[in-house]
């Protein structure tokens, strides 16, 4: 017989020999025997040799032996007869404790050939242990004031046997005050207790002696008893009461020392000392409980003071009592059940297998990215592992098999929003506390070309000065692409188009990489004011994506054009203009008018006129209008003035720096009786039939002027009568004006009937204004094709400024400044136009416009301007504001060609007479000259 407790020097060799022979030697078997505990030495167990099929004669030669893992002296085999018998006393409670099953395992080994047999000998329990109470006597102190059905817990008996042998029943000795409350089978945790069924009276029965008997279920029955000494207390009639009779707590087996287990709470309805509670374990608590737990007497807190071992004890039942300080003291009882929980000491393990990394951003949902396997060496709940993913979006974990997961794409990706994800896979077991392990997964998102280059704004406005050097950098376009690498590599190009007769690429170019826009040639504001084109941005992706941006390049004007004089048809030698002026003219008489044009625009084309001083500081009786260019007398001429004057007129613009031009006017003073045969008074730049005036008979002019004066007086009288009549419309009324043009060579008129609202202001007239229509008399195509003016006719900036001080009707416009030049337009509001849509823009300061002026108006339904070389439908010769007198004609009346509109100018009719009153012919001649001067103005 060989047992592990004995020392066998050849055991290692034997074990090695057994392992080698086990590969080819068979012959294994298993036998079951049973033996009651407490069997005496030599008690028969079984015929082991016969049951194993071995001959008695071969037991010794084959080295028959039985090996046990525990005590080797309990069983023995007789090699002579092959019988297994009891060798020493077997105590089941000592061998297996309170385990439900108890057996002795033997390994029977025979050699030649090697055979191993397993034999299990079951040790059956017998009722050899009586019930035992913790103490032979239990003292109980019960107040006489305790109510009926009060329960007093008792510590039950314990039986070392198992099964029916440990099933206990209790009985109490007969009495009239108490009965025994025995918990049912499903209330094993609930302690045994005495229940009061009759009120106690200390004066009648101060003490009670009862006997509690416990009987097991064995055969024969065994019993145990305890003496119950009950002392009846007086006065303190309220015992402490716990919140619960049973507290259940779970503690892990590796709980640290000093950990609070529970804080049971008891309350006492008494006051003073009778309500002060002291906590303690019950007097009959086991020493094992006292070695592991401690209870604070004042707070009742139970803490851990010893090591907890799940394998040693899975639960601890702690009886607790709360005793007040009354006399006699009262006690409340409860039970604390501490369940020891096994510790989860193995964390899960994760294994990752990457399949498709990096993942393209256009991958479809459901694409598998990584395979994950988990493993936990624990068992039960502690080995059940679940996986989770953080962050979840846009991925998810899919369980494919037990402990196997797939990391798949859950929603669409966008590399431009998130280019990479750092995912954490957490594997957590079901233990308490749970253990976990984590693994990081780096998911990189590969870029695809899904974003076109984008500009910051759809269009840009660029201002470039004209006359820039070739290759000048004018702007830089920049487009951003949210993609990466070559998908974000942006190149720029022009969207080719035609600019007039030339290609766009002849004006500008764009650098393909930097997006810088260059002007390939000097830009000319007079030729090109606005250059609008598109720049395209394309990335290098496959397929390439792109977008366009619009550039509006405004060419800013510079003062690069000097004023140009408009040459007259009849002039003096050397480019000078000759003018003949009678000595009889008074102050303010217009001698000539210098006309010039500037190809620039804005202030660069706004012209002013200055009269250069003569040498030696001599004064001359002439001046020039600052913005009109009109040369007029500053005083009345007399005999002391030089007969000839050379006037130098400086024309300059308002640019920076200012550019100038010079005009020479030769003025000759003649006597009043001499005819100005070669006068060019019409001013520089005026062309037309006025030059034919030189050859007209002076007497014919005097006759025409006389007839015209009579007609004017008639019209003024008629108009005054008409205006004095009451009007239903007040100051503004609808009339039919008949507009007639009168010139120095006669009257040429074209009646144009139109219903208009004319508003006349109040106040005395200050000067003459004559309105006329440039239309010809009624004739073939005269209505549609008005007479063309001299192509040299242009309005300069000064003339345009002067026109702002004139009264202009609805169809008034401004002529273009010159060929290729910009339109100098100052929109204003006309008092003859009631539309509120008309814009209001003031002309430049100093342009000759005051707050009382009637100015041009552009608005819906009003033509802006006539084309180059055309006269406007109606215009006003510049002058100061005056009261307009308009003749009204019946609807069907015939309009005579001699009908015209004129404005009275009393100062011309009241000239100082230098001749005798009887010389009427000379007076008429002067009136004719005055009329001619007015027409020039």
UniProtKB/Swiss-Prot annotation:
It is found in: Cell membrane. The chain crosses the membrane at residues 698-718. Pfam families: Cadherin, Cadherin_2, Cadherin_tail. Residues 1-29 form the signal peptide. Keywords: Calcium, Cell adhesion, Cell membrane, Disulfide bond, Glycoprotein, Membrane, Metal-binding, Repeat, Signal, Transmembrane, Transmembrane helix. Residues 775-787 have a biased composition (Polar residues). SMART domains: CA. GO terms for biological process: cell adhesion; cell-cell recognition; homophilic cell adhesion via plasma membrane adhesion molecules; nervous system development. Residues 896-910 have a biased composition (Basic and acidic residues). Residues 30-697 are extracellular. Its main location: membrane. Forms homodimers in trans (molecules expressed by two different cells). Forms promiscuous heterodimers in cis (at the plasma membrane of the same cell) with other protocadherins. This is Protocadherin alpha-7. It comes from Homo sapiens. The lineage of its organism: Eukaryota, Metazoa, Chordata, Craniata, Vertebrata. The gene is PCDHA7.
């Amino acid at each position: 017989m060989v047992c592990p407790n004995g020392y066998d020097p050849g055991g290692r060799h034997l074990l090695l020999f057994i392992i080698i022979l086990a590969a080819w030697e068979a012959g294994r078997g298993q036998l079951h025997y049973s033996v009651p505990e407490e069997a005496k030495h030599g008690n028969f167990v079984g015929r082991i040799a016969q049951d194993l099929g071995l001959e008695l004669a071969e037991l010794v030669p084959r080295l028959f032996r039985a090996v046990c893992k525990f005590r080797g002296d309990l069983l023995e085999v007789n090699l002579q007869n092959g019988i297994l018998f009891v060798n020493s006393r077997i105590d089941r409670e000592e061998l297996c404790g309170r385990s439900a099953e108890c057996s002795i395992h033997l390994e029977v080994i025979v050699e030649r050939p090697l055979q191993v047999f397993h034999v299990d000998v079951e040790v059956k329990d017998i009722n050899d242990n009586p019930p035992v109470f913790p103490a032979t006597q239990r003292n109980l102190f019960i107040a006489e004031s305790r109510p009926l059905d009060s329960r007093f817990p008792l510590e039950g008996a314990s039986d070392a046997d198992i099964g029916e042998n440990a099933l206990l029943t209790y009985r109490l000795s007969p009495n009239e005050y108490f009965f025994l409350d025995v918990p049912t089978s499903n209330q094993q945790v609930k302690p045994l207790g005495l229940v009061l069924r009759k009120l106690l009276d200390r004066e009648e029965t101060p003490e009670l002696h009862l006997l509690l008997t416990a009987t097991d279920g064995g055969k024969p029955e065994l019993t145990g008893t305890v003496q119950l000494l009950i002392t009846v207390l007086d006065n303190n009639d309220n015992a402490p009461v716990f919140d619960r009779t049973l507290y259940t707590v779970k503690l892990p087996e590796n709980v640290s020392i000093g950990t609070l287990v529970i804080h049971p709470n008891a309350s006492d309805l008494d006051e003073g000392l009778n309500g002060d509670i002291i906590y303690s374990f019950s007097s009959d608590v086991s020493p094992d409980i006292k070695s592991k737990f401690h209870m604070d007497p004042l707070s009742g807190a139970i803490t851990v003071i010893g090591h907890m071992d799940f394998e040693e004890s899975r639960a601890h039942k702690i009886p607790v009592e709360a005793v007040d300080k009354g006399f006699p003291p009262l006690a409340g009882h409860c039970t604390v059940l501490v369940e020891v929980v096994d510790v989860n000491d193995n964390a899960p393990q994760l294994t990752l297998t990457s399949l498709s990394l990096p993942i393209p951003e256009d991958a479809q949902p459901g694409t598998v990215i990584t395979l994950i396997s988990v493993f936990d060496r624990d068992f039960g709940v502690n080995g059940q592992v679940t996986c989770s993913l953080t962050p979840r979006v846009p991925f998810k974990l899919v369980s494919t098999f037990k402990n196997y997961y797939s990391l798949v794409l859950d929603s669409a990706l966008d590399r431009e929003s998130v280019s990479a994800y750092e995912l954490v896979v957490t594997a957590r077991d079901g233990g308490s506390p749970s253990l976990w392990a984590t693994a990081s997964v780096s998911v990189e998102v590969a870029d695809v070309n899904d974003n076109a280059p984008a500009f910051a704004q759809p269009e840009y406005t660029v201002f470039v000065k004209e006359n820039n050097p070739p290759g000048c950098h004018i702007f830089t376009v920049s487009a951003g692409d949210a993609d990466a690498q070559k998908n974000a590599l942006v190149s720029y190009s022009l969207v080719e188009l035609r600019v007039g007769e030339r290609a766009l690429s002849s004006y500008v170019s764009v650098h393909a990489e930097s997006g810088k826009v260059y002007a390939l040639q000097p830009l000319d504001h007079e030729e090109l004011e606005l250059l609008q084109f598109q720049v395209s941005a394309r990335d290098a992706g496959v397929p390439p994506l792109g977008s366009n941006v619009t550039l509006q390049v405004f060419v800013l004007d510079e003062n690069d054009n000097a004023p140009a004089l408009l040459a007259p048809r009849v002039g003096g030698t050397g480019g000078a203009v000759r003018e003949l002026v009678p000595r009889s003219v008074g102050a303010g008489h217009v001698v000539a008018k210098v006309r010039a044009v500037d190809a620039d625009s804005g202030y660069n084309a706004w012209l002013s006129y200055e009269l250069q001083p003569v040498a030696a500081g001599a004064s001359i009786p002439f001046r020039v209008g600052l913005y009109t260019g009109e040369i007029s007398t500053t005083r009345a001429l007399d005999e002391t003035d030089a007969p000839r004057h050379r006037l130098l007129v400086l024309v300059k613009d308002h640019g920076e720096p200012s550019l100038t031009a010079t005009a020479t006017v030769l003025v000759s003073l003649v006597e009043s009786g001499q005819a100005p045969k070669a006068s060019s008074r019409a001013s520089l730049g005026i062309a037309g039939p006025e030059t034919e005036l030189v050859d007209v008979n002076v007497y014919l002019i005097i006759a025409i002027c006389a007839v015209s004066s009579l007609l004017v007086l008639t019209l003024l009288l008629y108009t005054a009568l008409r205006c004095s009549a009451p009007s239903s419309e007040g100051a503004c009324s609808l009339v039919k004006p008949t507009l007639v043009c009168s010139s120095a060579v006669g009257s040429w008129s074209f009646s144009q009937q139109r219903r208009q609202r004319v508003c006349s202001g109040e106040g005395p007239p200050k000067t003459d204004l004559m309105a006329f229509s440039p239309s010809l008399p009624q004739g073939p195509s005269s209505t549609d094709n008005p007479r063309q003016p001299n192509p040299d006719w242009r309005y300069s900036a000064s003339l345009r400024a002067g026109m702002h001080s004139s009264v202009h009707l609805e169809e008034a416009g401004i002529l273009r400044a010159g060929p290729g030049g910009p339109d100098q337009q100052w929109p204003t509001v006309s008092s003859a136009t009631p539309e509120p849509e008309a814009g209001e823009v003031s002309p430049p300061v100093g342009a000759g416009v005051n707050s009382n002026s009637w100015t041009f108006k552009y608005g819906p339904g009003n033509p802006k301007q006539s084309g180059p070389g055309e006269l406007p439908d109606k215009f006003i010769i510049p002058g100061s504001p005056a009261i307009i007198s308009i003749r009204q004609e019946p609807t069907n009346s015939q309009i005579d060609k001699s009908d015209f509109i004129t404005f009275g100018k009393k100062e011309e009719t009241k000239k100082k007479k230098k001749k005798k009153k009887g010389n009427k012919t000379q007076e008429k001649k002067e009136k004719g000259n005055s009329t001619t001067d007015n027409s020039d103005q």
